[in-house]
Amino acid sequence: MSLPSSYTALLNDLNRDVARARPADALQFCANWFNSKLEEQRRAHLASNTNFATTNASTPFSHNSVGPSDIVDFGGAAPGLASPTQRASLFHSDPFAPGAGGGALPVASLAVPMDASQSPDSTPAPATPAAPAAPAAPAAPFSSLGGSGSTSISNAAFIPPTFNLGRRTSVSAESMAPSAANAESDGSPLPKTVIPKSEEQMQRIRGSIGNNLLFRNLEQDQYRDVLLAMKEVKVDANVTVIEQGAQGDYFYVVEFGTLDVYVRSPDAVSEGAPSASALLGDKKVSYGPGSSFGELALLYAQPRAATVLSTSACTLWALDRITFRSILMETNSRRRALYEKFLMDVPLFERLSAAERAKISDSLELREYSRGEAVISQGERGSEFFIIVEGDAEVRKTKQGGEEVVGKLSRGDYFGELALLNNAPRAATVAAAGATDDARLRVVTMSERAFTRLLGPLAGILERHAKETYGDEYSAVHANANADAATSVNSAALARSGADTSFPHPMDSSAKPGEGAWSAPNPFA
Protein backbone atom coordinates (compact mmCIF):
# COMPACT_ATOMS: atom_id res chain seq x y z
CA MET A 1 0.00 0.00 0.00
CA SER A 2 1.55 3.30 -1.14
CA LEU A 3 1.70 6.31 1.17
CA PRO A 4 -0.15 9.53 0.27
CA SER A 5 2.02 12.01 -1.62
CA SER A 6 1.26 14.78 0.90
CA TYR A 7 2.50 12.56 3.74
CA THR A 8 5.72 11.76 1.88
CA ALA A 9 6.31 15.43 1.06
CA LEU A 10 5.75 16.38 4.70
CA LEU A 11 8.30 13.84 5.92
CA ASN A 12 10.81 14.99 3.32
CA ASP A 13 10.46 18.57 4.53
CA LEU A 14 10.90 17.47 8.13
CA ASN A 15 14.00 15.42 7.30
CA ARG A 16 15.49 18.38 5.46
CA ASP A 17 14.93 20.80 8.37
CA VAL A 18 16.27 18.29 10.91
CA ALA A 19 19.41 17.82 8.81
CA ARG A 20 19.91 21.58 8.68
CA ALA A 21 19.21 22.35 12.33
CA ARG A 22 20.69 19.25 13.99
CA PRO A 23 18.52 19.79 17.09
CA ALA A 24 19.68 18.67 20.51
CA ASP A 25 16.10 17.69 21.40
CA ALA A 26 14.67 15.96 18.32
CA LEU A 27 11.25 15.28 19.87
CA GLN A 28 10.72 18.92 20.86
CA PHE A 29 11.94 20.10 17.47
CA CYS A 30 9.46 17.82 15.65
CA ALA A 31 6.60 18.93 17.91
CA ASN A 32 7.34 22.59 17.24
CA TRP A 33 7.78 21.87 13.53
CA PHE A 34 4.37 20.20 13.18
CA ASN A 35 2.71 22.95 15.24
CA SER A 36 4.22 25.50 12.88
CA LYS A 37 2.94 23.61 9.84
CA LEU A 38 -0.53 23.39 11.37
CA GLU A 39 -0.52 27.11 12.06
CA GLU A 40 0.54 27.85 8.48
CA GLN A 41 -2.30 25.70 7.19
CA ARG A 42 -4.87 27.49 9.37
CA ARG A 43 -3.52 30.87 8.34
CA ALA A 44 -3.65 29.94 4.66
CA HIS A 45 -7.24 28.79 5.15
CA LEU A 46 -8.17 32.11 6.72
CA ALA A 47 -6.44 34.03 3.94
CA SER A 48 -8.63 32.26 1.39
CA ASN A 49 -11.79 32.79 3.45
CA THR A 50 -14.25 35.10 1.73
CA ASN A 51 -15.13 37.14 4.81
CA PHE A 52 -11.47 37.63 5.71
CA ALA A 53 -10.57 38.73 2.19
CA THR A 54 -13.49 41.19 2.10
CA THR A 55 -12.59 42.72 5.45
CA ASN A 56 -8.93 42.99 4.48
CA ALA A 57 -9.54 44.59 1.10
CA SER A 58 -9.28 48.15 2.41
CA THR A 59 -6.15 47.56 4.48
CA PRO A 60 -3.04 49.37 3.20
CA PHE A 61 -0.16 47.18 2.05
CA SER A 62 -2.18 43.99 2.30
CA HIS A 63 -1.64 41.19 -0.16
CA ASN A 64 -4.53 42.34 -2.37
CA SER A 65 -4.34 46.13 -1.99
CA VAL A 66 -3.02 48.72 -4.41
CA GLY A 67 0.61 49.65 -4.16
CA PRO A 68 3.88 47.91 -4.89
CA SER A 69 3.50 44.60 -6.58
CA ASP A 70 5.37 42.59 -3.97
CA ILE A 71 6.42 42.95 -0.35
CA VAL A 72 9.56 41.13 0.72
CA ASP A 73 8.82 38.82 3.65
CA PHE A 74 11.56 36.60 5.02
CA GLY A 75 9.26 34.69 7.34
CA GLY A 76 9.84 33.80 10.97
CA ALA A 77 12.43 31.78 12.77
CA ALA A 78 12.25 28.04 12.50
CA PRO A 79 10.62 26.27 15.45
CA GLY A 80 12.87 24.56 17.92
CA LEU A 81 15.84 26.84 17.23
CA ALA A 82 18.08 25.86 20.14
CA SER A 83 21.03 28.13 19.42
CA PRO A 84 22.42 30.52 16.85
CA THR A 85 24.53 27.79 15.34
CA GLN A 86 21.30 26.30 14.00
CA ARG A 87 20.62 29.38 11.91
CA ALA A 88 20.57 27.32 8.72
CA SER A 89 16.94 26.41 9.48
CA LEU A 90 15.90 29.93 10.40
CA PHE A 91 14.12 30.68 7.15
CA HIS A 92 11.94 28.13 5.40
CA SER A 93 11.93 29.50 1.86
CA ASP A 94 13.47 31.96 -0.52
CA PRO A 95 11.66 35.27 0.05
CA PHE A 96 12.37 36.42 -3.47
CA ALA A 97 11.10 33.31 -5.19
CA PRO A 98 8.25 33.88 -7.68
CA GLY A 99 5.05 34.52 -5.81
CA ALA A 100 6.70 34.77 -2.43
CA GLY A 101 5.79 38.41 -1.92
CA GLY A 102 2.05 37.90 -2.01
CA GLY A 103 1.87 34.86 0.18
CA ALA A 104 0.42 34.32 3.60
CA LEU A 105 0.40 37.14 6.05
CA PRO A 106 2.93 37.09 8.89
CA VAL A 107 1.77 36.13 12.36
CA ALA A 108 2.61 39.58 13.73
CA SER A 109 0.12 41.14 11.32
CA LEU A 110 -2.89 39.26 12.71
CA ALA A 111 -4.75 41.73 14.86
CA VAL A 112 -6.52 40.93 18.10
CA PRO A 113 -10.33 41.10 17.69
CA MET A 114 -11.95 44.06 19.41
CA ASP A 115 -15.32 45.70 19.62
CA ALA A 116 -16.20 48.00 16.75
CA SER A 117 -16.84 50.90 19.12
CA GLN A 118 -13.44 50.59 20.75
CA SER A 119 -10.41 52.34 19.26
CA PRO A 120 -6.95 50.76 19.44
CA ASP A 121 -5.84 53.25 22.11
CA SER A 122 -9.02 53.38 24.17
CA THR A 123 -9.33 51.90 27.64
CA PRO A 124 -12.12 49.35 28.20
CA ALA A 125 -14.65 50.02 30.95
CA PRO A 126 -14.21 47.98 34.12
CA ALA A 127 -16.18 44.78 34.10
CA THR A 128 -19.01 44.22 36.55
CA PRO A 129 -17.97 41.78 39.31
CA ALA A 130 -19.45 38.37 38.78
CA ALA A 131 -19.95 35.39 41.00
CA PRO A 132 -17.07 32.94 41.19
CA ALA A 133 -17.22 30.35 38.49
CA ALA A 134 -15.50 27.10 37.77
CA PRO A 135 -12.05 27.37 36.21
CA ALA A 136 -12.21 27.75 32.49
CA ALA A 137 -10.82 25.03 30.27
CA PRO A 138 -7.57 25.83 28.47
CA ALA A 139 -8.10 27.46 25.13
CA ALA A 140 -7.21 25.57 21.96
CA PRO A 141 -3.83 26.64 20.62
CA PHE A 142 -5.25 27.81 17.30
CA SER A 143 -8.65 29.02 18.47
CA SER A 144 -7.73 32.60 17.62
CA LEU A 145 -7.18 31.60 14.01
CA GLY A 146 -10.65 30.21 13.50
CA GLY A 147 -12.80 27.38 14.71
CA SER A 148 -15.80 26.98 16.95
CA GLY A 149 -14.86 29.69 19.47
CA SER A 150 -17.13 32.63 20.17
CA THR A 151 -14.73 35.08 18.53
CA SER A 152 -12.99 34.59 15.22
CA ILE A 153 -10.37 36.67 13.51
CA SER A 154 -12.29 36.38 10.27
CA ASN A 155 -14.98 38.63 11.79
CA ALA A 156 -12.53 41.27 13.08
CA ALA A 157 -11.05 44.23 11.30
CA PHE A 158 -7.50 43.69 10.09
CA ILE A 159 -5.28 46.36 11.64
CA PRO A 160 -2.22 47.53 9.67
CA PRO A 161 1.21 47.12 11.27
CA THR A 162 1.52 50.90 11.73
CA PHE A 163 -1.60 51.41 13.84
CA ASN A 164 0.39 51.42 17.07
CA LEU A 165 3.66 52.85 15.78
CA GLY A 166 3.60 56.01 17.89
CA ARG A 167 3.20 54.27 21.24
CA ARG A 168 6.05 53.49 23.56
CA THR A 169 7.36 49.96 23.08
CA SER A 170 9.88 47.76 24.80
CA VAL A 171 12.99 46.64 22.96
CA SER A 172 14.28 43.12 23.51
CA ALA A 173 16.53 40.67 21.74
CA GLU A 174 16.52 36.92 21.28
CA SER A 175 18.07 34.88 24.05
CA MET A 176 21.12 33.22 22.56
CA ALA A 177 23.89 31.19 24.15
CA PRO A 178 26.58 29.02 22.60
CA SER A 179 26.04 25.40 23.55
CA ALA A 180 28.31 22.40 23.26
CA ALA A 181 25.20 20.37 22.38
CA ASN A 182 25.16 22.04 18.97
CA ALA A 183 28.70 20.97 18.07
CA GLU A 184 29.64 18.07 15.88
CA SER A 185 29.92 14.60 17.39
CA ASP A 186 33.70 14.94 17.61
CA GLY A 187 33.41 18.21 19.55
CA SER A 188 34.33 20.51 16.67
CA PRO A 189 32.08 23.54 16.05
CA LEU A 190 29.44 23.54 13.35
CA PRO A 191 30.59 24.79 9.94
CA LYS A 192 30.27 28.51 9.30
CA THR A 193 27.94 30.02 6.74
CA VAL A 194 30.08 30.73 3.68
CA ILE A 195 28.53 32.13 0.49
CA PRO A 196 31.13 32.45 -2.32
CA LYS A 197 31.89 35.96 -3.54
CA SER A 198 34.43 37.42 -5.92
CA GLU A 199 37.18 39.65 -4.59
CA GLU A 200 35.57 42.60 -6.37
CA GLN A 201 32.27 41.94 -4.60
CA MET A 202 34.07 41.64 -1.25
CA GLN A 203 35.74 45.00 -1.84
CA ARG A 204 32.41 46.66 -2.66
CA ILE A 205 30.80 45.27 0.49
CA ARG A 206 33.78 46.40 2.58
CA GLY A 207 33.48 49.89 1.15
CA SER A 208 29.76 49.99 1.94
CA ILE A 209 30.01 48.91 5.58
CA GLY A 210 33.48 50.21 6.43
CA ASN A 211 32.20 53.34 8.18
CA ASN A 212 29.14 51.71 9.72
CA LEU A 213 29.21 51.82 13.51
CA LEU A 214 28.13 48.17 13.82
CA PHE A 215 31.08 46.88 11.78
CA ARG A 216 33.76 49.47 12.53
CA ASN A 217 35.14 47.77 15.64
CA LEU A 218 34.80 44.13 14.58
CA GLU A 219 37.90 42.01 14.82
CA GLN A 220 39.44 40.70 11.64
CA ASP A 221 38.01 37.18 11.89
CA GLN A 222 34.55 38.50 12.81
CA TYR A 223 34.62 40.95 9.91
CA ARG A 224 35.57 38.19 7.47
CA ASP A 225 32.82 35.86 8.75
CA VAL A 226 30.22 38.62 8.35
CA LEU A 227 31.25 39.30 4.76
CA LEU A 228 31.20 35.61 3.86
CA ALA A 229 27.76 35.07 5.46
CA MET A 230 25.99 37.71 3.34
CA LYS A 231 23.73 36.16 0.72
CA GLU A 232 22.87 37.52 -2.70
CA VAL A 233 19.29 38.68 -3.24
CA LYS A 234 17.92 39.72 -6.64
CA VAL A 235 14.92 42.06 -6.70
CA ASP A 236 12.82 43.17 -9.67
CA ALA A 237 11.70 46.73 -10.22
CA ASN A 238 8.78 48.10 -8.15
CA VAL A 239 9.26 45.66 -5.29
CA THR A 240 9.00 46.77 -1.67
CA VAL A 241 12.20 45.50 -0.07
CA ILE A 242 11.25 46.71 3.41
CA GLU A 243 7.93 48.18 4.54
CA GLN A 244 7.47 50.90 7.12
CA GLY A 245 6.06 49.45 10.35
CA ALA A 246 6.94 45.84 9.53
CA GLN A 247 9.36 43.88 11.69
CA GLY A 248 12.92 44.07 10.42
CA ASP A 249 15.25 41.07 10.23
CA TYR A 250 17.72 41.93 7.47
CA PHE A 251 20.50 44.40 6.72
CA TYR A 252 21.14 45.12 3.03
CA VAL A 253 24.07 46.30 0.92
CA VAL A 254 23.28 47.48 -2.62
CA GLU A 255 25.59 46.05 -5.27
CA PHE A 256 23.58 46.99 -8.35
CA GLY A 257 20.39 48.95 -9.01
CA THR A 258 18.54 51.89 -7.46
CA LEU A 259 15.97 52.16 -4.68
CA ASP A 260 13.86 54.99 -3.23
CA VAL A 261 13.13 55.58 0.44
CA TYR A 262 9.66 56.75 1.52
CA VAL A 263 8.45 57.82 4.96
CA ARG A 264 4.71 57.87 5.72
CA SER A 265 3.24 60.03 8.47
CA PRO A 266 1.54 58.10 11.31
CA ASP A 267 -1.94 59.44 10.46
CA ALA A 268 -1.74 58.66 6.74
CA VAL A 269 -3.51 55.31 7.16
CA SER A 270 -6.60 56.79 8.80
CA GLU A 271 -7.35 59.36 6.09
CA GLY A 272 -9.99 57.45 4.16
CA ALA A 273 -8.85 55.53 1.08
CA PRO A 274 -5.56 57.17 0.09
CA SER A 275 -3.77 56.63 -3.18
CA ALA A 276 -0.76 54.39 -3.62
CA SER A 277 1.63 57.37 -3.44
CA ALA A 278 0.02 58.52 -0.19
CA LEU A 279 0.42 55.06 1.26
CA LEU A 280 4.12 55.12 0.46
CA GLY A 281 4.59 58.59 1.95
CA ASP A 282 7.12 61.25 1.03
CA LYS A 283 10.26 60.36 -0.86
CA LYS A 284 13.31 61.13 1.26
CA VAL A 285 16.39 59.75 -0.48
CA SER A 286 17.56 57.32 -3.16
CA TYR A 287 20.04 54.47 -2.80
CA GLY A 288 22.50 53.25 -5.41
CA PRO A 289 25.44 50.85 -5.64
CA GLY A 290 27.52 50.93 -2.47
CA SER A 291 24.67 52.09 -0.22
CA SER A 292 23.38 50.12 2.76
CA PHE A 293 20.21 50.22 4.85
CA GLY A 294 18.37 48.35 7.60
CA GLU A 295 21.32 48.08 10.00
CA LEU A 296 19.13 48.45 13.12
CA ALA A 297 17.56 45.09 12.27
CA LEU A 298 20.88 43.49 13.24
CA LEU A 299 20.41 44.64 16.83
CA TYR A 300 16.76 43.97 17.65
CA ALA A 301 13.36 43.30 16.07
CA GLN A 302 12.24 46.91 15.76
CA PRO A 303 9.57 48.08 13.26
CA ARG A 304 10.99 49.60 10.10
CA ALA A 305 11.04 53.40 10.07
CA ALA A 306 10.67 53.75 6.29
CA THR A 307 9.65 51.94 3.12
CA VAL A 308 12.34 51.07 0.56
CA LEU A 309 11.05 50.49 -2.98
CA SER A 310 13.21 49.28 -5.86
CA THR A 311 13.05 51.50 -8.96
CA SER A 312 15.03 49.09 -11.12
CA ALA A 313 16.24 45.52 -11.04
CA CYS A 314 18.59 45.27 -8.06
CA THR A 315 21.21 42.93 -6.67
CA LEU A 316 21.48 43.14 -2.89
CA TRP A 317 23.60 41.43 -0.26
CA ALA A 318 21.55 40.55 2.82
CA LEU A 319 22.60 39.64 6.36
CA ASP A 320 20.04 38.56 8.96
CA ARG A 321 20.14 39.40 12.67
CA ILE A 322 20.51 35.83 13.92
CA THR A 323 23.53 35.17 11.71
CA PHE A 324 25.18 38.46 12.66
CA ARG A 325 24.68 38.01 16.39
CA SER A 326 25.71 34.37 16.33
CA ILE A 327 28.96 35.20 14.53
CA LEU A 328 29.80 37.77 17.19
CA MET A 329 28.73 35.54 20.05
CA GLU A 330 30.48 32.38 18.87
CA THR A 331 33.67 34.32 18.19
CA ASN A 332 33.53 36.06 21.55
CA SER A 333 32.85 32.77 23.31
CA ARG A 334 35.87 31.07 21.73
CA ARG A 335 38.06 34.08 22.40
CA ARG A 336 36.94 34.29 26.02
CA ALA A 337 37.77 30.62 26.63
CA LEU A 338 41.19 31.12 25.02
CA TYR A 339 41.95 34.18 27.15
CA GLU A 340 40.88 32.41 30.35
CA LYS A 341 43.21 29.52 29.51
CA PHE A 342 46.08 31.96 29.03
CA LEU A 343 45.31 33.74 32.32
CA MET A 344 45.42 30.46 34.24
CA ASP A 345 49.10 30.10 33.21
CA VAL A 346 50.04 33.51 34.64
CA PRO A 347 51.35 33.08 38.22
CA LEU A 348 49.83 36.37 39.38
CA PHE A 349 46.36 35.19 38.30
CA GLU A 350 46.48 31.50 39.19
CA ARG A 351 44.68 32.08 42.49
CA LEU A 352 41.89 34.17 41.01
CA SER A 353 38.44 32.61 40.91
CA ALA A 354 36.82 31.61 37.61
CA ALA A 355 34.46 34.59 37.84
CA GLU A 356 37.38 36.99 38.35
CA ARG A 357 39.28 35.55 35.39
CA ALA A 358 36.12 35.86 33.29
CA LYS A 359 35.91 39.57 34.13
CA ILE A 360 39.52 40.06 33.09
CA SER A 361 39.13 38.13 29.82
CA ASP A 362 36.09 40.22 28.87
CA SER A 363 38.04 43.45 29.37
CA LEU A 364 41.17 42.49 27.41
CA GLU A 365 41.85 44.68 24.38
CA LEU A 366 43.27 43.23 21.16
CA ARG A 367 46.18 45.01 19.45
CA GLU A 368 48.29 44.26 16.39
CA TYR A 369 51.92 45.13 15.68
CA SER A 370 53.92 44.81 12.48
CA ARG A 371 57.34 43.21 12.31
CA GLY A 372 59.99 45.21 14.18
CA GLU A 373 57.47 47.44 15.98
CA ALA A 374 58.08 47.77 19.72
CA VAL A 375 55.29 46.75 22.08
CA ILE A 376 57.08 48.04 25.19
CA SER A 377 60.43 49.82 25.49
CA GLN A 378 63.11 49.39 28.09
CA GLY A 379 63.10 52.11 30.74
CA GLU A 380 59.59 53.42 30.11
CA ARG A 381 57.00 53.38 32.87
CA GLY A 382 54.78 50.33 32.61
CA SER A 383 51.04 50.44 33.10
CA GLU A 384 49.80 47.52 30.95
CA PHE A 385 49.99 43.74 30.93
CA PHE A 386 50.25 41.74 27.67
CA ILE A 387 49.46 38.19 26.48
CA ILE A 388 50.51 37.00 23.01
CA VAL A 389 47.56 35.60 21.05
CA GLU A 390 49.27 35.08 17.70
CA GLY A 391 52.76 35.62 16.32
CA ASP A 392 56.27 35.87 17.75
CA ALA A 393 58.15 38.54 19.68
CA GLU A 394 61.75 39.22 20.68
CA VAL A 395 62.95 40.40 24.09
CA ARG A 396 65.79 42.88 23.72
CA LYS A 397 67.99 44.46 26.36
CA THR A 398 70.44 47.31 26.04
CA LYS A 399 73.91 46.31 27.23
CA GLN A 400 77.07 48.41 26.96
CA GLY A 401 75.64 50.72 24.37
CA GLY A 402 74.22 47.97 22.15
CA GLU A 403 70.91 46.12 22.00
CA GLU A 404 70.99 42.35 22.42
CA VAL A 405 68.23 39.76 21.97
CA VAL A 406 67.86 37.93 25.28
CA GLY A 407 64.75 35.86 24.62
CA LYS A 408 61.86 35.01 22.34
CA LEU A 409 58.15 34.88 23.10
CA SER A 410 55.34 33.10 21.25
CA ARG A 411 51.63 32.31 21.52
CA GLY A 412 50.46 32.07 25.12
CA ASP A 413 53.48 33.86 26.62
CA TYR A 414 52.96 37.01 28.67
CA PHE A 415 54.99 40.00 29.79
CA GLY A 416 54.57 43.22 31.75
CA GLU A 417 52.50 41.62 34.53
CA LEU A 418 54.17 43.71 37.25
CA ALA A 419 52.58 46.79 35.71
CA LEU A 420 49.43 45.69 37.55
CA LEU A 421 51.32 46.03 40.87
CA ASN A 422 53.25 49.25 40.28
CA ASN A 423 54.49 51.55 37.56
CA ALA A 424 58.10 50.36 37.67
CA PRO A 425 60.26 50.97 34.56
CA ARG A 426 60.29 48.24 31.94
CA ALA A 427 63.30 45.93 32.27
CA ALA A 428 63.52 45.12 28.55
CA THR A 429 62.14 45.94 25.13
CA VAL A 430 59.63 43.56 23.52
CA ALA A 431 59.19 43.92 19.75
CA ALA A 432 57.21 42.04 17.12
CA ALA A 433 59.18 39.47 15.14
CA GLY A 434 58.50 37.06 12.33
CA ALA A 435 59.97 35.19 9.40
CA THR A 436 58.38 37.44 6.76
CA ASP A 437 57.95 41.19 6.37
CA ASP A 438 54.16 40.93 6.56
CA ALA A 439 54.22 38.95 9.82
CA ARG A 440 51.93 40.35 12.49
CA LEU A 441 51.98 40.13 16.26
CA ARG A 442 48.58 40.05 17.97
CA VAL A 443 48.45 40.65 21.70
CA VAL A 444 45.74 41.35 24.25
CA THR A 445 46.40 43.98 26.85
CA MET A 446 44.93 45.19 30.11
CA SER A 447 45.83 48.31 32.06
CA GLU A 448 46.34 48.56 35.80
CA ARG A 449 43.46 51.03 35.96
CA ALA A 450 41.05 48.59 34.26
CA PHE A 451 42.16 45.73 36.52
CA THR A 452 41.64 47.86 39.65
CA ARG A 453 38.23 48.99 38.40
CA LEU A 454 37.07 45.39 37.95
CA LEU A 455 38.69 43.52 40.83
CA GLY A 456 40.44 46.05 43.04
CA PRO A 457 44.20 46.35 43.64
CA LEU A 458 46.10 43.19 42.73
CA ALA A 459 48.19 43.48 45.90
CA GLY A 460 44.98 43.25 47.92
CA ILE A 461 43.97 40.08 46.06
CA LEU A 462 47.36 38.50 46.72
CA GLU A 463 47.09 39.42 50.39
CA ARG A 464 43.60 37.92 50.55
CA HIS A 465 44.82 34.58 49.22
CA ALA A 466 47.83 34.64 51.54
CA LYS A 467 45.50 35.23 54.47
CA GLU A 468 43.30 32.31 53.44
CA THR A 469 46.33 30.03 53.06
CA TYR A 470 48.68 31.07 55.86
CA GLY A 471 46.59 33.08 58.34
CA ASP A 472 46.49 36.73 59.33
CA GLU A 473 50.05 36.97 60.64
CA TYR A 474 51.57 35.84 57.33
CA SER A 475 49.23 37.56 54.87
CA ALA A 476 51.19 40.77 54.24
CA VAL A 477 54.60 39.08 54.24
CA HIS A 478 53.65 36.36 51.77
CA ALA A 479 51.69 38.71 49.53
CA ASN A 480 54.73 40.95 49.15
CA ALA A 481 57.01 37.96 48.60
CA ASN A 482 54.72 36.68 45.84
CA ALA A 483 54.76 40.06 44.14
CA ASP A 484 58.55 40.24 44.33
CA ALA A 485 58.87 36.74 42.87
CA ALA A 486 57.08 37.73 39.64
CA THR A 487 59.13 38.91 36.68
CA SER A 488 58.31 41.56 34.11
CA VAL A 489 59.09 39.17 31.24
CA ASN A 490 57.93 35.58 31.10
CA SER A 491 61.04 33.85 32.44
CA ALA A 492 59.67 30.45 31.45
CA ALA A 493 59.76 31.47 27.81
CA LEU A 494 63.29 32.81 28.21
CA ALA A 495 64.44 29.54 29.79
CA ARG A 496 62.99 27.55 26.89
CA SER A 497 64.94 29.68 24.43
CA GLY A 498 68.20 29.26 26.40
CA ALA A 499 68.67 33.04 26.64
CA ASP A 500 70.43 34.91 29.41
CA THR A 501 67.85 35.77 32.07
CA SER A 502 70.19 37.61 34.40
CA PHE A 503 68.97 41.15 33.84
CA PRO A 504 67.86 43.05 36.98
CA HIS A 505 64.39 42.71 38.41
CA PRO A 506 62.27 45.76 37.48
CA MET A 507 61.20 46.34 41.08
CA ASP A 508 64.81 46.48 42.34
CA SER A 509 67.28 47.89 39.82
CA SER A 510 70.22 47.05 42.10
CA ALA A 511 69.38 43.36 42.50
CA LYS A 512 71.59 40.70 40.97
CA PRO A 513 70.82 37.12 40.03
CA GLY A 514 70.49 35.00 43.16
CA GLU A 515 70.06 38.01 45.43
CA GLY A 516 67.17 39.97 46.94
CA ALA A 517 63.83 39.96 45.17
CA TRP A 518 65.12 37.89 42.26
CA SER A 519 65.46 34.76 44.40
CA ALA A 520 62.36 35.27 46.55
CA PRO A 521 60.31 32.05 46.67
CA ASN A 522 56.69 31.90 45.54
CA PRO A 523 54.61 31.02 48.63
CA PHE A 524 51.72 29.90 46.41
CA ALA A 525 53.75 27.45 44.34
Swiss-Prot record:
A Pfam family that this protein carries is RIIa
Which residues are in coiled coils? none
Residues that, per the record, bind 3',5'-cyclic AMP 1: E295, R304
| GO process annotations (BP) | adenylate cyclase-activating G protein-coupled receptor signaling pathway; cellular response to glucose starvation; cellular response to nitrogen starvation; negative regulation of Ras protein signal transduction; positive regulation of transcription by RNA polymerase II; protein localization to bud neck; regulation of cytoplasmic mRNA processing body assembly
Is ATP-binding a UniProt keyword of this protein?
no
Q: Detail which positions bind 3',5'-cyclic AMP 2.
A: E417
Sorted UniProt keywords: cAMP, cAMP-binding, Nucleotide-binding, Phosphoprotein, Repeat
Task: Outline the segment boundaries, as ranges, of region: Disordered.
Answer: 114-146, 170-196, 497-525
Could you give the subunit structure recorded for this chain?
A: Tetramer, composed of 2 regulatory (R) and 2 catalytic (C) subunits. In the presence of cAMP it dissociates into 2 active monomeric C subunits and an R dimer.
Which protein, by its recorded name, is this?
cAMP-dependent protein kinase regulatory subunit
Q: Whose protein is this, by species?
A: Mycosarcoma maydis (Corn smut fungus)
Its lineage reads:
Eukaryota, Fungi, Dikarya, Basidiomycota, Ustilaginomycotina
Q: Which gene encodes it?
A: PKAR
